């Protein structure tokens, strides 16, 4: 089952897959303030109903683990570092965990990292424009996730260090009054 807490900010390139739990939990109300939605979904019917309700027309399945990269540790590490780089998307990011575990980190209004530890049956919806990052857990080193999309699947990350603000980012910042 999901855990939400403030990140301890003690991560490095060598240990970012560890849990980094500060001991300060985060409530669902705190997540709602930044537009993050969490659901616990145990059946395909529930997932399909959510997709219909939120007008998600497309989906795919992604598997992240070393075998998915033909056991090429360099390619695997490069992808994990890419996902862990702080970024946002112009569309909602919807992930349903089917297998394994992963961490999604999102920024709160004070620019602190909130960490979500996701396991099977956890679904997370991140609003367009929110800064976030992802990594596998050190324990599992594997995740199989269903990605849901309103339109055709696209995945363009806009890294924070570029300083680029699109309409999606500006709208998100206004929505949460940052």
Curated annotation (Swiss-Prot):
Protein's cellular compartments = Cytoplasm; Nucleus
Q: Mind telling me which GO cellular component terms the entry cites?
A: cytoplasm; nucleus
Q: What class of enzyme is it?
A: oxidoreductase
Q: Does the keyword Cell inner membrane apply?
A: no
Catalysis: reaction(s): 1,2-dihydroxy-5-(methylsulfanyl)pent-1-en-3-one + O2 = 4-methylsulfanyl-2-oxobutanoate + formate + 2 H(+); 1,2-dihydroxy-5-(methylsulfanyl)pent-1-en-3-one + O2 = 3-(methylsulfanyl)propanoate + CO + formate + 2 H(+)
Cite the cofactor comment: Binds either 1 Fe or Ni cation per monomer. Iron-binding promotes an acireductone dioxygenase reaction producing 2-keto-4-methylthiobutyrate, while nickel-binding promotes an acireductone dioxygenase reaction producing 3-(methylsulfanyl)propanoate.
Q: Where does this protein act, in terms of pathway? A: Amino-acid biosynthesis; L-methionine biosynthesis via salvage pathway; L-methionine from S-methyl-5-thio-alpha-D-ribose 1-phosphate: step 5/6
**Short name of one Pfam family:** ARD
Its domain of life?
A: Eukaryota
**Residues binding Fe(2+), per UniProt:** 87, 89, 93, 132
Keywords, alphabetical: Amino-acid biosynthesis, Cytoplasm, Dioxygenase, Iron, Metal-binding, Methionine biosynthesis, Nickel, Nucleus, Oxidoreductase
Q: Which cysteines are joined by disulfide bonds?
A: none
Q: Which residues form a coiled coil?
A: none
Q: What is its EC number?
A: 1.13.11.54, 1.13.11.53
Necessary cofactors: Fe(2+); Ni(2+)
Q: Which Gene3D superfamilies match?
A: Jelly Rolls
Major place of localization? cytoplasm
Please provide, alphabetically and separated by semicolons, the GO molecular function terms listed in this UniProt record.
Answer: acireductone dioxygenase (Ni2+-requiring) activity; acireductone dioxygenase [iron(II)-requiring] activity; iron ion binding; nickel cation binding
Q: Name one GO biological process term.
A: methionine metabolic process
Which residues make up the binding site for Ni(2+)? Answer: 87, 89, 93, 132
Function as written in the Swiss-Prot or TrEMBL entry: Catalyzes 2 different reactions between oxygen and the acireductone 1,2-dihydroxy-3-keto-5-methylthiopentene (DHK-MTPene) depending upon the metal bound in the active site. Fe-containing acireductone dioxygenase (Fe-ARD) produces formate and 2-keto-4-methylthiobutyrate (KMTB), the alpha-ketoacid precursor of methionine in the methionine recycle pathway. Ni-containing acireductone dioxygenase (Ni-ARD) produces methylthiopropionate, carbon monoxide and formate, and does not lie on the methionine recycle pathway.
**Name of the protein:** Acireductone dioxygenase
The organism named in the record is: Candida albicans (strain SC5314 / ATCC MYA-2876) (Yeast)
């Amino acid at each position: 089952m999901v855990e939400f807490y403030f990140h301890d900010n003690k991560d490095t390139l060598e240990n970012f897959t560890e849990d980094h739990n500060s001991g300060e939990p985060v409530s669902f109300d705190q997540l709602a303030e930044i537009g993050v939605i969490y659901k616990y979904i145990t059946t395909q019917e529930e997932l399909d109903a959510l997709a219909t309700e939120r007008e998600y027309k497309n989906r795919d399945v992604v598997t992240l683990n070393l075998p998915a990269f033909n056991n090429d540790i360099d390619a695997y590490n490069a992808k994990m570092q890419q996902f862990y780089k702080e970024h946002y998307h112009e569309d909602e990011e919807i992930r349903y965990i089917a297998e394994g575990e992963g961490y999604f980190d999102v920024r709160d209004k004070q620019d602190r990292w909130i960490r979500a530890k996701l396991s099977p049956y956890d679904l997370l919806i991140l609003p367009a424009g929110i800064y976030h990052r992802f990594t596998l857990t050190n324990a599992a080193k594997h995740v199989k996730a269903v990605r849901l999309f309103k339109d055709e699947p696209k995945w363009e990350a806009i890294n924070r260090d570029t300083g680029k603000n699109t309409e999606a980012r500006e709208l998100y910042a206004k929505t949460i009054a940052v």
